[in-house]
Design a protein with these regions (language model features):
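Acidic/histidine-rich catalytic cores of soluble enzymes
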Residues: 37, 71-72, 171-221
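Conserved beta-strand edge residues that scaffold enzyme active sites
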Residues: 77-78, 110, 158-159, 195-196
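Secondary-structure boundary/capping motif
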Residues: 84, 162, 198-199
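Active-site groove signature of glycoside hydrolases
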Residues: 143-163, 184, 189-193
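Active-site cleft segment of glycoside hydrolase catalytic domains centered on the general acid/base Glu
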Residues: 160-174
Length: 221
């Protein structure tokens, strides 16, 4: 698939899976206090992000005033490279505090939006690639810590046909990430949304293999 076609496919997919219409549904409901706690994931508003109608800095106010929700979930791509600006991150901290928003998690996707190519994978059989991916994810662990998130979600994409090798590579990479993250109180979670992670038995083996309080799963229904 050509790059332009892949980009269009991604954007169209995001449009179909997003929920900019949530306002009427949520505002029309009443939830019994202490019975149900909700958070909003900025990925749900991806079309607005790509149309420059929404910025990460707008998110705390948006979910508080439009939906009455007190917890935010983020997506690495939504930062659009602005996470490299320390003043941007500081401003996100300030706005989150001003609107009494708890920041929970960053979904970390290593995708070049210009080429639509995947970046280095934590589950690769090539050590050089795994090391590159480790550096990328450690950076996002630091960002997550700065804005008060308790977790980042990682992907375990691999072309390796041997599931046991993918398990070993993934276990090694995540264990190294935990060495970096645990001092900051940030956990690493794996979502069942593609490839080997869709195998529940394999995912259980991964959790047991790593055996850490700083690793977990994120069910994708």
């Amino acid at each position: 698939m050509k790059t332009s076609s892949r980009r269009k496919f991604l954007f169209n997919s995001l449009a179909l899976t997003s929920f900019p219409f949530l306002s009427s549904g949520i505002n029309g409901c009443t939830f019994e206090k202490n019975k149900l706690e909700l958070a909003l994931q900025i990925y749900s508003f991806a079309p607005l992000l790509f149309q420059n109608k929404l910025d990460v800095l707008m998110f705390p106010q948006m979910i508080k005033e439009n939906y009455g929700i007190n917890a935010a979930e983020y997506w690495s791509i939504a930062f659009m490279g602005k996470e490299k600006d320390k003043s941007f991150i500081k401003e996100l901290q300030i706005r989150s505090k001003d609107y009494d928003i708890d920041n929970l998690i960053i979904l970390v996707d290593n995708i070049d939006l210009k080429t639509m190519e995947n970046g280095p994978s934590l589950a690769s059989s090539e050590k050089v690639e795994r090391d590159q991916s480790l550096s990328f994810h450690k950076y996002w662990i630091d960002i997550a810590s700065e804005i008060g998130c308790h977790s980042i979600r990682v992907n375990l994409r691999s072309d390796e046909s041997d599931d046991n090798k993918v398990l070993d590579n993934s276990s090694e990479s995540i264990s190294k990430l935990i060495e970096h993250s645990k001092g900051q109180g940030v956990s690493i979670v794996v979502e069942n949304h593609g490839g080997i992670t869709g195998d529940a038995d394999w995912l259980v083996r991964l959790m047991k293999n790593i055996n850490s309080d700083f690793v977990g799963t994120l069910p994708d229904f």
